[in-house]
Amino acid sequence: MKMKVLEAKIIYESDDLEKYKKIISDIFYSFGVTGLKIEEPILNKDPLNFYKDEKQFLISENSVSAYFPLNIYSEKRKKVLEETFAEKFSEDEDIVYNLDFYEYDEEDYQNSWKKYLFVEKVSEKFVVKPTWREYEKQDNELVIELDPGRAFGTGSHPTTSLLLKLMEEQDFSNKSVIDIGTGSGILMIAGKILGAGEVYGTDIDEFSMEVAKENLILNNISLNDVKLLKGNLLEVIENKKFDIVVCNILADILVKLLDEIKYILKENSIVLFSGIIEDKLNEVISKAEDVGLEVVEVKADKEWRAVYFKRK
């Protein structure tokens, strides 16, 4: 079955291109993407061979593209993206932009995406290595092999690296773990590498399920040793509680999920959240305290925050 990908592409012009490239990128990142394609007006290939190959061309526009699974939520996602950018830029006279959407077969673009991804040391211990890159493991490093596809990055975005930093500081030995909104499966893989016993991953998207399965296998993790469940949390998890909950999702969704997460916690459970923009941190903490959690640690990277909670 071919997977489909939705590309959201913004072409923009401004006298301050760097400023708006960052703003556009941060908005896309706030929607949960972990990899972007950024194009600027430069020669796309070797300039020495430009006249020898008529297929070569100049990139003539500034653009930022984000990639999402194409599914039943895509039309809503388009609308929300349009509204978000319109609200941000409607009264800003310093930028002119156009947002368009395109649909592709995932496998048609798999190879072209690979050139944008590299080996990344994302925390003190964890190294994330795309399968097509060579890397010599150093002492004490924990290497995650990833073939993320065009719709996922490799863990270098602050939201993922912050959560991996929190994870490597915990004792996962034989613990039961659930990753809510697993995406590429990177946090499930990290949990297993850190010695977890039972590892569950949930997501509402079939595309994510397939990508996560492939990445688990790449890391020599048998699908019999984990559970991947498609659906909303309490619909797929019944009468099960976990030692550790990890979740890298937008703050607004985290706030809503906490009303469900409270039912899957043990007395001494810990909860590790990321995906929280600085302005939303207090809202997430307040809701977490309402459901019986207390803050142990907050990690920061630029405007992003990750939080370590435990049961009170």
Swiss-Prot record:
S-adenosyl-L-methionine binds at T160, G181, D203, N248. The keyword S-adenosyl-L-methionine applies. SUPFAM superfamilies: S-adenosyl-L-methionine-dependent methyltransferases (SSF53335). Its EC number is 2.1.1.-. InterPro entries: Ribosomal_L11_MeTrfase_PrmA, Ribosomal_PrmA_MeTrfase, SAM-dependent_MTases_sf. Keywords: Cytoplasm, Methyltransferase, S-adenosyl-L-methionine, Transferase. Gene3D superfamilies: Vaccinia Virus protein VP39. It is found in: Cytoplasm. It holds the Pfam family PrmA. One of its GO terms (molecular function) is protein-lysine N-methyltransferase activity. One of its GO terms (biological process) is methylation. One of its GO terms (cellular component) is cytoplasm. Its main location: cytoplasm. Coiled coil: none annotated. Methylates ribosomal protein L11. Belongs to the methyltransferase superfamily. PrmA family. This is Ribosomal protein L11 methyltransferase. It comes from Fusobacterium nucleatum subsp. nucleatum (strain ATCC 25586 / DSM 15643 / BCRC 10681 / CIP 101130 / JCM 8532 / KCTC 2640 / LMG 13131 / VPI 4355).
